[in-house]
Amino acid sequence: MRNRSLGLTVLAVTALVVSACSNTGGGAASASPAAANPCAGATAHTGGTHSFPTDKTKWKIGVSTDVGTVNDKNFNEYTNNGAKAGATALGAAEPPVVVPKDASELAKNIQGFVDQNFDIIVTAGFNNGQATNCAAHANPDIWFIGVDQGPPCVTPDGLPDSAFKCAGDAKTLLPKYVAISYQEDQPGYLAGMVAATMSKSGSIGAIGGITLCGPCVRYIQGFQLGAQKVNPNIKLFVSWVTTSDFTKAFNDPVTGKNFGAQFITTNKVDVLFQVAGKTGNGILDAACDAGIYGIGVDVDQALSYPNASKCTVTSAEKKLSLSVSTDIANIVAGTQKGGDDHWDAKRDGIGYSPFHDLESKVPATLKQQLDDALAQMKAGTLKTCPDKCGDISTLPK
């Protein structure tokens, strides 16, 4: 079961943050114009109705990342890898990549690909949600793949809905906007099973980047249920790096390390799950420094962040590259639909990472339990999120 509200609330809040050119989400005065006309900067491409190449090797694919670096060993990089794999499978040119200096450049970078009449524009992360929605609204004849942006919340006119009424049908209004979403509670559940099994103290922790992040909430909700499945008496401590600053939440490993170290000292946990992007790399560093196990997020962080591989027992994975490359193939084949493109265990869209150097520390019984749980997820018989899925009030304070 998925809850639409919090995942989309973060897009609405991000829209206000970006429009104000601030990471604090401040100032109703600066946010009001964006609420009235959120897509003022998005324009249609020139040259009439866009036509797609009949030769699949001629398709032009571009990638617009989130703030940070393309080789961030995380969301941007794996999204880009998926686009490159999709292009390679077609025999098309390697996609060019643009990286914003800050959130104010997100829309401009996407518009750049529109102006060059690209066929498929891939955008990374929920922070790109409003800009991608706007570009897709202005250019309904160009394909957009928005990673971690589904399901889209739009007005009856197909514009981003910062009032969060979601009265529009995105699939109809934005027919070529493929907004990828993931069932975060499923990999979170698997990570929770690992945490509860590996814990000796019976106390485990989870740190999310920002309270506004619906996917972060679902990750930790699944983590809680998975841990309780293994040990009903497990103690879970949860904290959040920030309530308003997206840069600090997801792109500040120094803050992450300091925050993680204090969290470990205060709560005496011996397994720590990070759900904070690049900030979480610092949290994993803190786990290693404290001599406890860390659990990564989104990608296999034992590989993507080798600095912490010695203590990263597993990661709760979204198959980012697979979802992007698959959607590119489906678009060119003519089978892809717009709207929410949901990836879960049934589509092999989630999973847990190998144990790598810590393989010998993991009981064989846990490996079998994880395989069984994943099989139940694929069959749709395992509940991995509470009834209020996506509701932060269900988590420990």
Predicted features along the sequence, with ranges:
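A residue-level marker of the well-folded mature domains of exported/periplasmic proteins
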Residues: 23, 29-397
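N-terminal targeting and processing segments of secreted/endomembrane and organelle-targeted proteins
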Residues: 3, 23-24
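N-terminal export and membrane-targeting signals
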Residues: 1-12
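C-terminal motif of bacterial Sec signal peptides marking the signal peptidase cleavage site
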Residues: 17-20
